[in-house]
Amino acid sequence: LVFRLLMSYLYENYIYPNKLTNRMKITLIRAEKESGKEALSTLEADALIKKLKTETKAGHVSTLRAILPQLEGTCAQYEHIDKLPRIYPAVEYSRTQEGERRMKNYNGLVQLEINRLSGIAEAEYVKRQAALLPQTFAAFCGSSGRSAKIWVLFALPDGTTPKLESDAALFHAHAYRMAVKCYQPLLPFAITLKEPSL
C-alpha cells in the first residue's frame, strides 16, 4: 500500500504523465584514443532508441559481448572500447566558443543501472519488469550484454524541468533516489547505486 501511494504521488507530481517527448536530445560523448579529444554529438531520443536496436557494420557491441568473458580477471580491455560512446540521457550538452561542455537542456531522465547480470535473459527480464511502471521512458540491455539500463522521466509539478545546471543537479539527485526506491521492489537484482550526476 505504501509503495502504491508513493508511486501515485510520484506519478502525479514528479513524473511526466503521458507527456513523453521524443524530441528531447540525448548527448553522446566519445573519447578519441589517438587525439585525446572528446567528440560530442546529440540525437533525438527516438532516433537514439532506433539506433540502439540495430548494430553498425563495425559490430563493436557484438565483439565486446563475445570477448568480455575472456577479459574477466585480467587488466586487458576491449581495444575498440573508445568507439562506443557514453550516453548522457539527463542532459543535452553543447560546446561554448572555448570548447567547454555546457548544459543546454535538462531532460529529466534518470538512468538506473542493474549490473552483473548473467546475460541477455536476465537483462530482458529487467526490461519487462521496468515496463510495468508507466513512468519508464525506456529500458535496454547494456553494451556488455550483462547489464540493463532503465530511463525514468521526471519533471517538476508544472511539467517543466530545471533550467539552471545547479538546480538540475539537485533535482536530478533527488529524482535518482526516488527512482531507486520505486524500481528496486520490482527487481530481484540489486540496482547498482551510483553518485547521481548529470
Give the ranges of each region predicted by the language model.
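DNA replication initiation modules
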Residues: 26-35, 98-120, 155-198
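DNA replication initiation on ssDNA origins
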Residues: 2-108
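Hydrophobic, Leu/Ile/Phe/Ala-enriched alpha-helical segments that form helix-helix packing faces
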Residues: 68-71, 75, 130-134, 179-187
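Short amphipathic alpha-helix segments
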Residues: 119-134
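Short, conserved phosphate-binding/catalytic loop or strand-edge motifs used
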Residues: 142-157
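Short acidic amphipathic segments
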Residues: 136-139
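Short connector loops at helix/strand junctions that flank enzyme active sites
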Residues: 105-107, 134, 145
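Short Gly/charged-rich anion-binding patches and loops
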Residues: 47, 125, 178
